[in-house]
Swiss-Prot record:
Residues 237-249, 267-276 have a biased composition (Low complexity). It comes from Bos taurus. Residues 221-236 have a biased composition (Basic and acidic residues). InterPro entries: DUF5524 (IPR040247). Residues 31-52, 179-288 are annotated as: Disordered. Residues 206-217 have a biased composition (Polar residues). This is Uncharacterized protein C7orf57 homolog.
Amino acid sequence: MRNTSKELHGAASRYAPCDWYYHLPVKQSEKAVDAPPASQIPGLSDPREAPSGHTLGLRRYWVKETDSEYVKLAKQGGRPDLLKHFAPGTTKGSPVAYSLPDWYIHHSKPPTADQRQVPAVSIPDYMVYEEFNPDQATGNFESRMGPFDFDMKTIWQREAEELEKEKKKVRLPAIKSKYPSKVGTPLGHREPAGSKLSFPPIPGQRPSSPTNFSKLISNGYKDEWLQQQADSDKRAPQTPQSSVSSPSPLDAELPADPEAPGDTTEAAESSPLSSAAPPPDSTPVELK
């Protein structure tokens, strides 16, 4: 015969207990169990019971000295009826419409549909044409001005007003002196002859002639200008011998410029004059 008691005992001990994984009561108890509060903030959990056995009237025990003013006000319930709106009349009966507060409108009772005025639609003044009627005009009449152009006069009216202004200008007579011989003409009207500078025109220059770039790149205009300067120096009248001074030793030491042909011609022309001039009485002192 088989021992059934041993098999049942072995089957029951084959699985490990699951007490560490979950707690499942064998039978639902009918006794009421106190659940933890939904929130730790006083007043947000079950308001029927106060913490530490105090009643709702003794909420001063919740406020601590270390709390801020905002926390103290929140623990005491805040301002009464802060977010409530009380409609006029009784709350019992048919529901009433939402009434506007007194501070939002000027009168306590809103106007009915018959009392409401229809807003008048008006057009801007510059879009309305109204003929001027002198019979209805008063002293305070002002013509309507446009949105941009404020000049209501015609060109003929403007010209007539300008002519009247010119005529109204006071013109003083010229002051005539009793002694015209002693009074000289002012220098402001006529400039003296010495103050005006006049430059001779450059010979051979044509303002209308186009620029030759090949001549410009090859320094052709430079050579032409140097030749014109040499020709103008040759045509200039020669100064007398008395006005020509002997060359200084510094001028003799300076080398001649090979690019300036006008300097060579001037040196050639001044050489016979300088040789004919008598030698100076005293030699100049050499510069240190």
